[in-house]
């Protein structure tokens, strides 16, 4: 711990006499430096930054002129010198600091303008390890942290977007920066270096295949404030992380009202579900409400899939999210706008489809640029009071499972197709989850119940109600198959499904009463498949 024996008054306004500029991103650099020069501010710079300023006709002192020491080791050592860091860290009102600065010829630096080597961009480009390591900035973060620590006297700029803010203050205060701004810039500086170091740590963890490192860092760039969170009394914001997985975060909002917290959460759930279906093989549509599906279907076209999905629960679909695994086309768009919908999320959209959606000015249309790979790894995070739960993404795909037929009767080809379809869907339903499906479409969904039997009954009840609305004489579950996200702990859930008219069952298995459940299935002529994989979702 450093003990300061005397407190010195922090100047509210501090004149900027000397600025050090060393940037990788040279956007707006020359114009900014020209304004600094107009205030009589001495410019110190390094390498390529110095060359850019000299080319623009600005008087610049190279760092090596200040230090009397050339840059060495391919530029790795340029600013790591007492004559630079003394100028950044010196407390101007401390007599001992002033004496040391005078003794060693250290000039105070009042403004530091630094942005860093593009480490994350280099990592994401697929560069080799050596190139990535060479893009770990050392001198830049050191200067940023030093200037931020000494923000009582030194301003630090780490973002091009802050150039105008600084210039406005210099104009307002006749060449001075206020303590308020210096403190704000210092806070942003530490946010910047923390995120930079977090990215480096994440790369090393990935490179060394350390899935759960001793320290886990989560960083994201502020993207936007939201009107509120899940409820109006909660504040919320959206932060973009380094994850490039296609979805809400990568999406362009082509039209519609501002996205809410719940819109984004639901759209993410919807798109992750629909991504379970290969867009090269089939068209698929998912309808989501409160992060749970109320209808999912495959079809030869998006229109067919949408209409099949809507049949599952058209009441709950009102005011929901529509997710597509293929580009939105004119025919599907024409159907979607017939029902009030909050958000459409798709990998792309045709011009004709966009024109139709434009008729509903409040309807948000999100274009993601692609469909995420359901097999792709990654981490999911859940916050707790005083901690964070981290787990690998549930990237198990039913196509890859070694399915075990455990009943006397094997499922038919059509039943097996529907069983696999239903198990794709049940993966994305809140536990306890039960999904009834027929002809590659859900016909009943039971979600989020404490009892698996209750989930099964709710799914049947909704299917029966929907059949009545459609004028049908029997439940939609007749002739369907059923999927369960976890094993049936007792035979009652399976018996309930059999009474609803199912012909085949897919579930993980693994209960101590599996044999009892198998016998109940055999007694009712059901085919049953064990996946060996559970899909709890909370």
UniProtKB/Swiss-Prot annotation:
Record SMART domains: AICARFT_IMPCHas (SM00798), MGS (SM00851)
Record-linked CDD domains: IMPCH (cd01421)
Lineage top rank: taxon: Bacteria
Domain MGS-like: 11-158
Pathway where it operates: Purine metabolism; IMP biosynthesis via de novo pathway; 5-formamido-1-(5-phospho-D-ribosyl)imidazole-4-carboxamide from 5-amino-1-(5-phospho-D-ribosyl)imidazole-4-carboxamide (10-formyl THF route): step 1/1; Purine metabolism; IMP biosynthesis via de novo pathway; IMP from 5-formamido-1-(5-phospho-D-ribosyl)imidazole-4-carboxamide: step 1/1
EC nos: 2.1.2.3, 3.5.4.10
Reaction(s) catalysed (UniProt annotation): (6R)-10-formyltetrahydrofolate + 5-amino-1-(5-phospho-beta-D-ribosyl)imidazole-4-carboxamide = 5-formamido-1-(5-phospho-D-ribosyl)imidazole-4-carboxamide + (6S)-5,6,7,8-tetrahydrofolate; IMP + H2O = 5-formamido-1-(5-phospho-D-ribosyl)imidazole-4-carboxamide
Family, similarity comment: Belongs to the PurH family.
Protein name: Bifunctional purine biosynthesis protein PurH
Natural source organism: Bartonella bacilliformis (strain ATCC 35685 / KC583 / Herrer 020/F12,63)
Gene (name only): purH
């Amino acid at each position: 711990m450093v003990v300061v024996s005397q407190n010195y008054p922090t100047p509210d306004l501090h004149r900027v006499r000397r600025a050090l500029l060393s940037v990788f991103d040279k956007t707006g650099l020359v114009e900014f430096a020209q304004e600094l020069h107009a205030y009589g501010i001495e410019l110190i710079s390094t390498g390529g930054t110095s060359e850019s300023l000299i080319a623009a006709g600005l008087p610049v002192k190279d760092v090596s002129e200040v230090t009397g020491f050339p840059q060495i080791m391919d530029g790795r050592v340029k600013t790591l010198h007492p004559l630079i860091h003394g100028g950044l860290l010196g407390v101007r009102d401390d007599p001992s600091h002033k004496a040391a600065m005078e003794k060693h010829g250290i000039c105070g630096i009042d403004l530091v303008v630094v942005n860093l080597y593009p480490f994350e961009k280099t990592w994401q480009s697929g560069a080799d390890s050596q190139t990535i390591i060479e893009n770990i900035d050392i001198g830049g973060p050191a200067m940023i942290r030093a200037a931020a620590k000494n923000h009582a006297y030194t301003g630090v700029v780490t973002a091009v977007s802050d150039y105008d803010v600084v210039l406005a203050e210099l104009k307002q205060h006749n060449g001075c920066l206020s303590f308020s701004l210096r403190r704000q810039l210092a806070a942003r500086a530490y946010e910047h270096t923390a995120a930079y170091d977090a990215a480096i740590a994440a790369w090393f963890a990935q490179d060394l295949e350390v899935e759960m490192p001793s320290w886990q860092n989560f960083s994201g760039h502020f993207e936007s404030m939201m009107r509120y969170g899940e409820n109006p009394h909660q504040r919320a914001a959206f932060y973009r992380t380094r994850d490039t997985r296609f979805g809400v975060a990568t999406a362009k909002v082509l039209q519609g009202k501002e996205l809410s917290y719940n819109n984004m959460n639901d759209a993410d759930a919807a798109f992750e579900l629909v991504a379970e279906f290969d867009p090269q093989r089939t068209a698929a549509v998912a309808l989501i409400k409160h992060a749970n599906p109320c209808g999912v279907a495959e079809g030869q076209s998006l229109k067919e899939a949408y209409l099949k999905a809507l049949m599952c629960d058209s009441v709950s679909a009102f005011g929901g999210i529509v997710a597509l695994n293929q580009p939105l086309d004119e025919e599907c768009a024409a159907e979607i706008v017939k029902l009030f919908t909050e958000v459409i999320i798709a990998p792309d959209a045709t011009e004709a489809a966009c024109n139709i959606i434009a008729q509903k000015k409040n309807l948000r249309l999100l274009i993601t640029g692609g469909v995420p790979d359901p097999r792709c790894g990654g981490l999911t995070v859940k916050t707790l009071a005083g901690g964070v739960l981290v787990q690998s993404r549930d990237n198990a795909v039913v196509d890859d499972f070694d399915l075990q037929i455990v009943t006397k009767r094997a499922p038919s080809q059509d039943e097996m197709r529907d069983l696999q379809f239903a198990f794709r869907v049940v993966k994305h339903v809140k536990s306890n989850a039960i999904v009834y499906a027929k002809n590659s479409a859900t016909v009943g969904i039971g979600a989020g119940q404490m009892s698996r039997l209750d989930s099964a009954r709710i799914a049947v009840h909704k299917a029966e109600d929907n059949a009545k609305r459609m004028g049908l004489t029997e439940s939609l579950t007749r002739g369907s198959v059923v999927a369960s996200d976890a094993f049936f702990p007792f035979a009652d859930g399976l018996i309930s499904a059999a009474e609803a008219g199912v012909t085949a069952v897919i579930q993980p298995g693994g209960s101590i009463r599996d044999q009892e459940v198998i016998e109940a299935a055999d007694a009712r002529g059901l085919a049953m498949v064990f996946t060996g994989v559970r899909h709890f979702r909370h």
